[in-house]
Amino acid sequence: MTAARPRTRSAEGRWAVRVVLLVAGFALVLALLTGARRLGALPDLLRGSVAALVLFGVSGDALAVRLCPPALQPVRPVLALALGMAAGPLALTVLGILHIPLAVTLPLVLVAGLAASWWVRRRGGREAVAPLDVHVLVATAAVGVLLGCVVLIPMWGSGVVSVPGINPDAHQVVGSAALLQQAPPDATRVQLGLDHIPTVWGSKWPIFYALAAASNLSGLDPLGAFPTMAALLAVLAALGFGALAGEAFGLGRRGGLVVAAVSGLSWVTIHLAVHPYWNQLWGYAALPWALLLGWLALNGRGEARAAVGCGLLLLLIALAYPLLFPYPVVILVLMAVALRRRPRLPAWGRRGGPIGFVLLGLILLVPLLAAVQKLSQAGSQLIHPGGAVWGGDVTSFIPFGDFVGTGGGILPALVILALAVWALVRVVPRRLALALGAALALFALLDVRLRTVPSGTYMDFKHLAFTGSLVVALGATGAVSLLRHRRREAAVLGAVLLAAWGVGAMIRDRREFKEHWVQVPPELSEIRDWSRALPPGTSVRIDIPQSGVQLWAAYFLAEHPVDSIDPVLFTTYAHPPWGAIADYSLALRVIPLRALRRLGVTGPPIRENRQFVLRRIVVPPGNTLPPTASLRQVQP
């Protein structure tokens, strides 16, 4: 272990204050650089944040009291949020599969959570609830709030509470949440913006239920509840890596605050939240907490009860983002091998646990089978050398520097990697260091496989997002250990490295926010008002090229049959059917009328704003083409 200066309580308090002030300064400068100066969105952001915190906190509090290992007792409320992130959505999913409406299940889950919190405290007495470290909790909360504000920069800049970024995945997420507010997950409702959850998204019901529940609690549309829940997930990921560094890597809680700040301000965390990659973000948020609880259960510091929390988070990862599931499993297996120990459930878990898990598995059979299918497809692609792998919206290999938060090419990545190696050699407990080192070596080999084929760009991004986050946490651990070293030269080096990382992260994050603003501006959501003003039963042709904008336009026109002459094809998205026959045309304002006249569009605009225009379509006499517009979408 690296020699460090002994610290008094007051010195540790000053350390935490400095960390909070540095994060606040970073957030303020970044907000000024990106033009995020509008507070009009604040009331709705507060409503969405409170709703997400209530959902996770109430769902996870009793579990945190029951399962929290001694090492995490001082920051138990943070663990409650992490466990509630899994427990609440899973409970809603189980009840939803039984066709109980969300309007009933959400109050039921919250009341059950409150009752369970009261029961575990009453049953265990004072000794069941260890005292909290108020100073650490306040500092952790302050860092978390600041990191959340950074993730919400698109809202501060636009003054609008809506989905950020450019990834059309958000259309399917919001549509799925809106459907679950009114129907069970296997239902079809053609009058909604998304009439059916696509089969390829069949494992992700819990994370759609979470958004639907937050929307109900806050009174916001799922569009409005989306950014605050994404911000909370990003914050939980950052705090999870900080807790992992503080408790497992041996850095201490206040050193872990620095790691949390570094992780939360890194490009990967911000990019997942604002692009956004909703499914991947959920797995990413659960990853560090699963690793931490698994380590504490295996090494004996967390007792066997930590294994239950680890298993719950692994289940969430498997359903939310099946491709991530092998990563924590590989790391945990290597931990068990290094420690020469097998995971054990607590006595009460061994008595009723197997039966409970079997029942849970039977109820969740459909999403579990969808997750297994996804994993098997990915595995079959990887074992064929040179074979193609899944593609997506990443069409070129992203520079290594982005994955360690600094931007740039291989050089900054090598510096952070060197710090990570230093941490493994000098800071992290030996057996854990062996397990993590072996895991990183395996992940490096996998990256070589992905970079040997042109189609590997998308999966390489996914892979390095998870691997890089672990390297960042280890690298920050190494830098903090240098900063706290007895030798002045080492402390200066640590400070310089952290400052250089901060400058690089500031530049990269600024570029990220310039590229990702609000995906659904007011002009786009105004189409919903136009739809309500149209005569019932009339149809609309969406004359918008293939894009996420077309999908959102169809979402807002859900009350009317729609079609498109250029629908979004060859994706995992439900989309309007192909067709040219309709009563109205919705087009981009920049498209001149003369280009639309050959498609029957005529007359002055019925509705228009700065981006879109709605006009009548006049079908030529003698037309024999059948109607093509439909309320039912084409499933991928």
Task: Name each region found by the language model.
Residues 145-285, 456, 461:
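Active-site lumenal/periplasmic loops and adjacent helix-entry segments of GT-C-fold
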Residues 320-324, 371, 446-450, 478, ...:
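Transmembrane alpha-helical segments
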Residues 296-315:
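Short hydrophobic alpha-helices at membrane interfaces in multi-pass membrane enzymes
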Residues 1-134:
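Membrane-embedded, hydrophobic transmembrane alpha-helices
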Residues 52-53, 169, 232, 280, ...:
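Hydrophobic/aromatic-rich transmembrane helices and adjacent perimembrane loops
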Residues 48-58, 283, 360-370, 385-436, ...:
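Alpha-helical transmembrane segments at the extracellular/periplasmic loop-to-helix junctions
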Residues 498-595:
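Short periplasmic/luminal acceptor-recognition loop of GT-C membrane glycosyltransferases, typified by
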